[in-house]
């Protein structure tokens, strides 16, 4: 993980620069009055990964300056990370320093925190882990009150569970999300809540049915589900589908049909070009002119999915790459126009800016 530069005094200026770039990028499509959702200037990251730098019997967390990638910068703490991570870092380091089984050939430490107060740490080694490691790791995890996983090549030791349970309030509902180690989760918990709130605000009053592609662990699915009669959500990752199934049950959501398939497969199914056993119990007809929600990878929507999107009256689009978002808007501009826009600063002090658009049929 490269070392970011961060100065809370500079944050408003940096955010304003990113917002100006977005508005300039989308001005030709009539974007105006963009809703701006800022991050906390510090303690915003719910995930953090650090190399472990050894000097004799000592060790420290380390990151690297991209301008000098061979020279480690050792850290006592990391202010962009959640306060719970910052509080844990020195305590965990001291435990690791004091135990040869835990320290030997330790390469990396990954932290996964939640707004609800849970913590999971993954320790990655350049050696096989043995019973002595497991005994020491169990004792340390109990003393620190954390979940712990040990990894090495071809080996994964989970001491309790390989996930955390996130929980927060949104629009009067208490939402819970299973977040699995190694799977994608939103890195900025505070901004994620703002994204969910904006999406719900835009969808309020739509009614009818919702199709969601790339649903992940159900982050948006669960937040949006009360606003629609029925939801059909798709996701290709097996671990994300399992997490989404857990999350739907944990939040008592009963109007969602979740199918493991790619956006291209679903597009072909809805167009009648292919039939899939996974969809045999789902009537697709009510979803043909529903609302479409997409939160695609950085590559944006492919040509097949864009063709699918043209058939929907409303498209809610969350993007982590405004360049591919712009390309997709150009491809859709003959059928859809932008009605609302928002930016979400998931990654302060970087050039990245999460974007949200509501597009409606012309």
Swiss-Prot record:
Listed Pfam families: tRNA_U5-meth_tr
Highest taxon above the source species: Bacteria
Active-site annotation: 320 (nucleophile), 354 (proton acceptor)
EC number of this enzyme: 2.1.1.-, 2.1.1.35
Transmembrane stretches, start-end: none
Amino acids binding S-adenosyl-L-methionine: 186, 214, 219, 235, 295
Reaction catalysis annotation: uridine(54) in tRNA + S-adenosyl-L-methionine = 5-methyluridine(54) in tRNA + S-adenosyl-L-homocysteine + H(+); uridine(341) in tmRNA + S-adenosyl-L-methionine = 5-methyluridine(341) in tmRNA + S-adenosyl-L-homocysteine + H(+)
Keywords: Methyltransferase, S-adenosyl-L-methionine, Transferase, tRNA processing
Function, as annotated: Dual-specificity methyltransferase that catalyzes the formation of 5-methyluridine at position 54 (m5U54) in all tRNAs, and that of position 341 (m5U341) in tmRNA (transfer-mRNA).
Protein name from the UniProt record: tRNA/tmRNA (uracil-C(5))-methyltransferase
Species per Swiss-Prot/TrEMBL record: Dechloromonas aromatica (strain RCB)
Lineage: Bacteria, Pseudomonadati, Pseudomonadota, Betaproteobacteria, Rhodocyclales
